[in-house]
C-alpha cells in the first residue's frame, strides 16, 4: 500500500480539484441567495416595501432569536439521521428547492407595507437556510481529516463564496437598474464597483492563504489581516469627510479594497477552525458530532448577524435617515427587484445541485453513536470544548461586523449626500467606526485560540489510532 493510500485509509483524504470546486459551489450558491438578502433586504424593506427602519430592525432581531431555537434542533436532527442520498449532502437538494422559493418571495412587493408578510417570508427563508447551512458546514469535516486539505478546501470554498459575493454586490445594482430602466446609469456603476471591491481581494489573496499561513502562522495571519481591515475602515471614514463620494470616488475605491482585503482573509479562514474544534471534541469525548458543532457555529454567526442586523436600522432611525425618493442610485422598481432575485435564486439552486453531485462523505459519526445524539449535547459540547467557545466569540464578533458594514454599504454609496449631517455621520459610523471597534475585539478573542496545526495533527493521529484498536 502506498503512503497516500495508507493515509486515506485513516481518513486523511486528498480531493481532486473538481471535488474541491464542487464543494465550494455550495457556498457560492448560498451566497447568491443569502448575501442578496443580507446586503439588500433592509434597503428593499425601507425604500421599496415601505417598512419603518426601526420596525425592520426589530424584525431582523426576532428572526435571529428564532434561529437560536431552530439551529440546535436542525443540528441534532442531522446528526441523528442518515438520508439515503448522504448524511449531510442530501439537504442541499431537500432544503434548496423551498429556500429558493421563499428567497424570491422576500423580494415580492405584492403585500407592500405588510409587516406580517415580511415576517412570514423572512423567518421561513432563514429557517430553510439553516437546513442547508448546518449540514453543509458539517460536510467539510466529513470529506477528510487532513489539515492541509482542509485549508485548501476552505480557501476554495471562500474563493467560490466571494465569487457569489462579487456577483451579488456588483451584479445586483446593475441588474436591477437594467431591468428597471433598460440601462445602467454611471452612478449605479460607481456603486457596483464600490460594493464589488468587497469581494475582489478574494481572487487575489484566498488562493495564497495556505502559503501565508505556513509562512507567518495561523494567529499572526489573523492579526495582520484584521489590522489591514481596520486601516481601510479608517481611510474610508476620513475620505468620506473630505467631500462628496463622487469627488473622491477613486480614493474610496482604494480604501474599500484595503478594508475588504483584511476582512475577506480573516473572516474567510475562520471557517477552517470549525473542523479543528470538531476533531478536538471527538478527541475529548469520543464522538464526532459534526452536526451539533455546526449548529453551534450557526447560532454564533446568526447571533452576530442579529446584533449587527439590528444596529443599522436603529442607528438610521435615531439619526433621522430619510429614504431618498428621486436621486437614489438604486432604482425603486419593485418588479425589477423581484426579477433580479428570481435570477440569482435559481442560479443558486443549480449550484446546490452541482455541489450535491461532487461531494462524498468519508469521515462521519459511527452508526452506534447516532441514536444517542440529543439537543442537550449542544450545550454539553459548548462547555466542554474550550476552543469551540473561543471561535464562538470570534464568529459572533466577525459576523456582527460584517452584518453592520454590509447593510450600511448601500446607504453609504446610494444617498449619503442626500441626508442631514447627523444621518450622514450615522452612516459613516455604520460603515467604518463600529466595524473597526469590533475587529479590535476579534483580535483579542483569536489570541486565546490554542489549537495550532501540530496539535491538531497529533489529535487526528490519536483518533485514528484509537479507531484501529477498537
Report each predicted region and the residues it spans.
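Membrane-embedded alpha-helical bundles of multi-pass transporters/translocases
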Residues: 2-470
Amino acid at each position: 500500500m502506498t503512503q497516500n493510500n495508507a493515509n486515506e485509509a485513516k481518513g486523511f483524504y486528498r480531493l481532486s480539484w473538481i471535488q474541491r470546486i464542487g464543494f465550494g459551489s455550495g457556498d457560492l450558491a448560498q451566497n447568491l441567495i443569502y448575501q442578496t438578502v443580507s446586503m439588500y433586504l433592509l434597503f428593499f424593506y425601507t425604500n421599496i416595501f415601505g417598512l419603518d427602519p426601526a420596525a425592520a430592525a426589530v424584525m431582523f432581531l426576532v428572526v435571529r432569536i428564532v434561529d437560536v431555537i431552530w439551529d440546535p434542533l436542525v443540528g441534532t436532527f442531522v446528526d441523528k439521521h442518515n438520508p439515503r442520498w448522504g448524511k449531510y449532502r442530501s439537504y442541499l437538494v431537500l432544503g434548496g428547492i423551498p429556500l429558493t422559493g421563499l428567497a424570491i418571495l422576500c423580494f415580492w412587493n405584492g403585500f407592500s407595507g405588510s409587516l406580517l408578510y415580511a415576517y412570514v417570508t423572512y423567518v421561513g427563508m432563514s429557517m430553510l437556510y439553516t437546513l442547508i447551512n448546518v449540514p453543509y458546514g458539517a460536510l467539510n469535516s466529513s470529506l477528510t481529516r487532513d489539515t492541509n486539505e482542509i485549508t485548501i478546501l476552505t480557501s476554495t470554498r471562500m474563493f467560490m463564496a466571494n465569487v457569489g459575493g462579487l456577483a451579488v454586490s456588483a451584479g445586483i445594482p446593475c441588474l436591477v437598474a437594467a431591468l428597471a430602466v433598460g440601462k445602467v446609469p454611471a452612478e449605479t456603476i460607481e456603486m457596483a464597483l464600490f460594493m464589488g471591491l468587497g469581494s475582489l481581494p478574494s481572487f487575489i489573496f484566498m488562493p495564497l492563504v495556505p502559503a501565508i499561513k505556513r509562512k507567518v502562522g495561523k494567529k499572526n495571519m489573523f492579526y495582520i489581516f484584521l489590522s489591514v481591515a481596520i486601516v481601510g475602515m479608517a481611510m474610508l471614514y476620513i475620505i468620506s469627510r473630505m467631500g462628496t463620494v463622487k469627488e473622491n470616488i477613486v480614493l474610496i475605491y482604494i480604501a474599500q479594497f484595503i478594508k475588504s482585503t483584511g476582512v475577506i482573509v480573516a473572516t474567510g479562514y475562520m471557517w477552517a477552525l470549525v473542523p479543528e474544534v470538531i476533531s478536538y471534541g471527538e478527541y475529548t469525548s469520543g464522538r464526532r458530532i459534526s452536526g451539533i458543532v455546526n449548529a453551534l457555529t450557526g447560532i454564533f454567526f446568526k447571533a452576530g448577524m442579529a446584533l449587527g442586523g439590528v444596529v443599522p436600522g436603529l442607528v438610521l432611525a435615531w439619526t433621522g435617515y430619510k429614504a431618498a425618493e428621486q436621486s437614489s442610485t438604486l432604482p425603486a422598481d419593485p418588479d425589477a427587484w423581484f426579477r433580479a432575485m428570481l435570477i440569482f435564486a435559481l442560479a443558486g439552486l443549480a449550484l446546490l445541485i452541482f455541489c450535491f453531485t461532487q461531494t462524498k462523505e468519508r469521515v462521519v459519526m459511527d452508526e452506534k453513536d447516532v441514536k444517542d445524539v440529543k439537543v442537550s449535547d449542544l450545550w454539553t459540547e459548548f462547555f466542554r470544548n474550550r476552543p469551540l467557545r473561543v471561535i464562538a466569540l470570534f464568529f459572533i464578533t466577525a459576523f456582527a461586523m460584517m452584518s453592520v458594514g454590509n447593510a450600511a454599504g448601500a446607504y453609504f454609496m446610494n444617498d449619503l449626500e442626500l441626508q442631514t449631517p447627523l444621518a450622514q455621520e450615522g452612516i459613516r459610523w455604520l460603515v467604518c467606526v463600529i466595524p473597526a471597534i469590533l475587529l479590535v475585539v476579534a483580535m483579542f478573542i483569536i489570541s486565546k485560540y490554542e489549537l495550532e496545526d501540530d496539535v491538531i495533527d497529533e489529535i487526528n493521529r490519536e483518533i485514528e489510532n484509537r479507531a484501529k484498536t477498537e
